[in-house]
């Protein structure tokens, strides 16, 4: 029996973190599955056979794929992989501008597409839902309201919870530091999480 291959695409730091955890869980279920795709160091450490390192390719999407330096070649290498290796499944993690191109390429080749961690279409770009419905076989979402949002649009969807909580469960919480930050009155701590792109951090943080 041929070894099953899965292709995963994650273009950003956050996607690399969640993608690495996903790869580990897949290998817990079936260590023989070979995983290829696009990612960064964490996914490689988890077992990704990396076609392209995406460390320097996180961009704000304002152009077509052909006009973004380097990404067109990345896309062509991915489609070549689809043709030659015929993966059993393509898993896309956020990074909507690029990943929808991959979804379309996979769909043309009759390769099932799963989208893990939805792009925030409910906040911006709701017109992309039509593309999702056409190109993606299964949305796997991390917020409860996203499940209702996609279901109302006729998209096959499953809510699985936020992977950040799984990540936190692997960390030791410094209770002394938490108590110090809250102060004597036990104040609530609020975290500012502007995103993983340098552009987002520079634009959104004070």
Q: Residue locations for each model-derived region?
A:
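Active-site and donor-binding regions of nucleotide-sugar-utilizing enzymes
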Residues: 4-182, 190-201, 205
């Amino acid at each position: 029996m041929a070894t099953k291959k899965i292709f995963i695409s994650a273009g950003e730091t956050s996607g690399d973190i969640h993608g690495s955890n996903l790869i580990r869980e897949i290998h817990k279920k079936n260590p023989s599955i070979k995983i290829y795709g696009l990612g960064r160091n964490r996914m490689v450490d988890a077992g990704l056979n990396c076609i392209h390192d995406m460390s320097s390719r996180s961009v704000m999407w304002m152009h077509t794929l052909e006009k973004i330096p380097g990404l067109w070649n990345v896309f062509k290498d991915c489609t070549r992989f689809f043709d030659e290796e015929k993966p059993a499944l393509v898993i896309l993690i956020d990074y909507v501008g690029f990943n929808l191109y991959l979804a379309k390429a996979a769909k043309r080749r009759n390769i099932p597409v799963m989208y893990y961690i939805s792009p925030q279409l409910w906040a911006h770009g709701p017109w992309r839902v039509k593309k999702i419905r056409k190109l993606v076989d299964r949305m796997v979402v991390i917020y409860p309201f996203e499940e209702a949002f996609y279901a109302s649009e006729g998209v096959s969807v499953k809510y699985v919870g936020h992977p950040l909580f799984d990540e936190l469960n692997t960390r030791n919480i410094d209770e002394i530091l938490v108590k110090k930050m809250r102060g004597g009155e036990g104040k609530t701590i609020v975290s500012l999480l502007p995103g993983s792109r340098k552009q987002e951090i520079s634009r959104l943080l004070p």
